[in-house]
Amino acid sequence: MIGIIAGDGSLPKLIVKRFNNKKFNHVVINLSKKKNKKQKYVFAITQISSIIQILKKNKCKEVILAGKVTRPNFTDFRFDKKIIKFLPKILDALKKGDSYLLDLVIDILKKEKMKVVSCTKYLPELFANNIKNKKLISSQDLKDIKKGKNLLENLNQKFDVGQSAIINNGFVVAIEAAEGTDQMLLKSSKILKKLNKNNQSGILIKLPKKIQDLRIDLPTIGFKTVKKCIDLRLNGIVLKKNAHIFLDQEKSIALIKKNNFFIKIIN
């Protein structure tokens, strides 16, 4: 039996749908803000004892964490004894960044003899690996890719930031911070419209951070991101192999084929 701890977003819904289609034995614990009456187990992240109890009751040996989970509300009356025990560590992790908080969740589950695994262990088709492009990648694109890769790798060695960047003809247009990729694209739209007024150029590059645990925090792109990049007249999106989930693949690939655009996978 596999436990799925589901937060907000489209990824948990997709995982549950695929698990149902493949008839994998699983139990879903809903941590989403949007509660579903059909779901049996609905909790807050602060109810860790109850969550573990359900996972043990269903004999879950492996657990998948997916979706965005709201940071703990320390005025929430639904605290339980186990979460209070870990409260000093939680506060310390929150100061360091979300990645450290996720590490703590893994540690708690490990102590309960449950292994956290990536959803791609059972759903490898979610990886953005096998994309066929019509558009040829230019020498300038390759230079932008190299610059973006070096930039992000150097930046996220020291800081819990820098999952993506926009590079246009050697110029760093934007670096993602806490706002997320789509908001970064939105904030960069004005300058990109000026840069790409007469031609199409530039790339969005996304790489996982060095401290990112890809079992529980795989970077994700989908149709919305692809469409926004095309609307901003970028040449393409660059992703790392076996490190990104690609949602809405069929819909996105159909859009890519209709436009002069590429998705490149790098090592």
Language model region names:
Residues L14-R18, I64, K228, K251-S252:
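A short acidic, amphipathic alpha-helical/loop segment
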Residues L11-P12, K95-S99, V105, E112-I230:
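Conserved mixed alpha/beta catalytic, RNA-binding, or beta-rich assembly cores of soluble enzyme
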Residues K13-I15, F74-D76, Q249:
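Short glycine-/acidic-enriched loop or helix-start segments at secondary-structure transitions
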Residues M1, K22-N25, K37, K59-K61, ...:
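Short coil/turn connectors at secondary-structure junctions
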Residues L31-N36, F43-Q53, C60, R78-F86, ...:
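Feature captures the catalytic cores and cofactor-binding loops of soluble hydro-lyases/lyases
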Residues I51-Y122:
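N-terminal glycine-rich phosphate/adenylate-binding segment common to multiple enzyme folds
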Residues M1-L31:
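N-terminal basic/disordered segments at the start of proteins
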Residues I4-A6, V27-N30, V63-A66, V116-K121, ...:
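General beta-strand structural signal in soluble alpha/beta enzymes
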